[in-house]
Amino acid sequence: MAELEKKPVKIVETILRDAHQSQIATRMTTEQMLPIVDKLDKVGYHAVECWGGATFDASLRFLHEDPWERLRKLRDGFKNTKLQMLFRGQNILGYRPYADDVVEYFVQKSAANGIDIIRIFDCLNDLRNLQTAVSAANKEKAHAQVALSYTLGDAYTLEYWTDIAKRIEDMGADSICIKDMAGLLLPNKATELVTALKETVKIPIDLHTHYTSGVASMTYLKAVEAGVDIIDTAMSPFALGTSQPATEVMVETFKDTPYDTGFDQKLLSEIADYFRPIRDEALDSGLLNPKNLGVNIKTLLYQVPGGMLSNLTSQLKEQHAEDKFYDVLEEVPRVRKDLGEPPLVTPSSQIVGTQAVFNVLMGERYKMVTKETKDILLGKYGATVKPFNPEVQKKCIGDEKPITCRPADLLDNELEKLEGEMAQYKEQDEDVLTYALFPQVAMDFFKYRQAQKTKVDEKAADKKNGAYPV
């Protein structure tokens, strides 16, 4: 190697979380994960992302698994590698803001069960929605990584990103992630952004993107050359398409350069061999849609994430209005502008997309308004980077007064009430958190868990006479 300073790029492996969430609807089971943990642990990853995001909901709802049990089993298996999770700020892993006591307890239990790095983001980049989670992570001595939800638009200048990065560092974050959920960050823009951020903050910078638009590997190359510290990749059987660039490809790309990871390709090949049959089985069963493996250039042309494109298509199909697809795509940026130009990530992408569909199909803008659109305009999700369109706001919410405080400031502590509601099913401390996020799904799971242990199906019980089937 030339006499250049060695600065190996660090790699976060997403195969146990975002890769299968992006390609097979988060359906990888704990049983499928555990046999390969020993080999994954030998690679030398900066971290393995294995929890949070949609895995919590999917484990309970579709796999009848306890997500906490999965985490404990993974922690037992990974002796040398840090475990990472994705956390939706004040929304935790759910779809609404929770009271601070629930957020703090969730962070505490995540760390206690084995999570080392907590990646925390907010769909509006409203830092007020992140503060409680960051402070809780600091208190638990977990690594608090705050993610910038990357997007494009007039408001999102280099100055915007450097200013918010500085505020994140001051807030107590241990590192920053550029979270490019839609694959919109182009290679040369990555050079500019990473260079500017490295000049602004001292904490490490991680880049997370998706291959949806086809540019992700080139973006990683330019970002690493510009000084990014960490990149997120997926083992090749679940890489590319809606997932991340392939781990093996990025490792080979940086071989014999100052950024050489030093990873063993033979070991990576053995890991890929393990996951390939799981991928093939998902293809055969239809769980893995071949469309999720290709490049969707519309993502770049319309600045709309891949998941949002498929969502719009299915909404229009239901209404027998597929011919309105391009009208809706043109309406999306207009609605986004009306709503303060939020990044298009869960849940803001669904809110903007659905409203755009209504506007086109009704033949009049904002004739029909969703509850979620009203809530954004009422400040219930937090502050947007730009002001709302005042005419649209007036039409949608009338004389209702928007809130300007942090949404969670209006919430009373919830834990005690939640504990009371699910006490009869509680088998571990963490159960109250499962119930807090998904009450109905949790109750169904608790009953299933009980039935597995007692071999009594509660649904088949004659409760009136206290009789149970054998």
Functional labels for PLM-detected ranges:
Residues M1-I24, L71, D76:
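N-terminal amphipathic alpha-helix/helix-capping segment at the start of soluble metabolic enzymes
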Residues I11, A19, L40, I120, ...:
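Conserved, mostly hydrophobic/aromatic
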Residues D41-S59, N289-T299, Q303-V470:
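Terminal or standalone catalytic/regulatory effector modules within metabolic enzymes
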Residues A47, G52-E169, I176, G183-P187:
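Active-site beta->alpha loop and helix N-cap motifs at the rims of alpha/beta catalytic domains
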Residues I120-C123, D180, A226-S243:
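Glycine-rich phosphate-binding active-site loops on the catalytic face of alpha/beta enzymes
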Residues Y156-I168, S213-D229:
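Catalytic cores of alpha/beta
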Residues A239-T261:
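C-terminal helical cap(s) of enzyme catalytic domains, especially alpha/beta-barrels
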